[in-house]
Amino acid sequence: MNKQKLLIVGGGGMVGATAAYACALRSVIEEIVLIDRNEDLAWGQAADINDAMGIDRNVVVHTGNYSDINDDDIVVITAGTPQLPGQTRLELIDVNAKIMRDIVKNIMANGAKPYLVIVSNPVDVLTYVALKESGLPKNRVFGTGTTLDTSRMKSYLADAFNVDSKAVDAYILGEHGDSSFSTIETAQIGEVPIREYPGFAEEMIDGIEQKVRERAYRVIETKKSTYFAIGFVVSKIVSALRKSTHTVYPVCSLAEGEYGLNNVVLGLPSTISSDGVKILAGYPLTEREKESLNKSAGIIAKMISHLDKAENC
């Protein structure tokens, strides 16, 4: 029986390499394989990470190819193209959907049944593409969803209330994009409702979603891209996939009836374990949050419909 390993498609890029580095630092898996069209760059990233592990090495990082994928391996896909000046979002979706289809075809070519974790953007739509192209069960294909958005919000609230971010219980849900929304109305710090927490002021949470987005935009403006935060998110997800503890993160996977949604992929509270992903049904949402969820789902559904029509033309 093959030992489970992590393979990162796009491992030569900053997101893929940083995800590999985070996984290696945290020792979440023993073998990491970087796959990239630029084989020299992938080799350099793998060598650099291995050198970092030299003093206390319990993880091996190396380059490889699609034929290295076996049943139950974890394949993280970070490859894709960024949005160009003047390019519409639908045009970007068309380009990255083609890239995703080609990657998934290569992944599935040897008949293995891995887990697919999508990081490439727009992550909700590309997760749908990967699921459809792979033919894998829906519990084996999911994206990072709004996990990074949630991490940003928890970091912001932890600073505002001067608490450990682990004490903050709140999510950003929906699209990993401009229609995302927070569950701030039912948020808690420890087990205390946020509005009852000592020192609470309404301005602390007013417009929290926009503040989270502006934080992301500011990071991109100053350093062109984000990779440390999403790399760490990937390491947490990979770790959860290797355990039976059913860790909850707002990843994106196919909804089939949950929260009244069908045939749409977006960030929802979900359990992740060695059994894969499962949407956590029944998470309490306010009426405002339900409206926001349906609005976000509608936006993603239109993008999915656009892709389905384009593919059938």
Show where each model-derived region lies.
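Extreme N-terminal starter segment of soluble prokaryotic enzymes
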Residues: 2-6
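Conserved glycine-rich cofactor-binding loop
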Residues: 12
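N-terminal Rossmann-fold NAD(P) dinucleotide-binding loop
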Residues: 16-17
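Short beta-strand element of Class I
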Residues: 29-33
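Conserved N-terminal Rossmann-fold NAD(P) cofactor-binding segment
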Residues: 35-72, 87, 301-308
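Rossmann-like NAD(P)-binding element
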Residues: 54-115
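Rossmann-like NAD(P)(H) cofactor-binding subdomain of soluble oxidoreductases
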Residues: 89-154
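C-terminal substrate-binding/catalytic lobe of Rossmann-fold NAD(P)-dependent dehydrogenases
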Residues: 134-140, 149-313
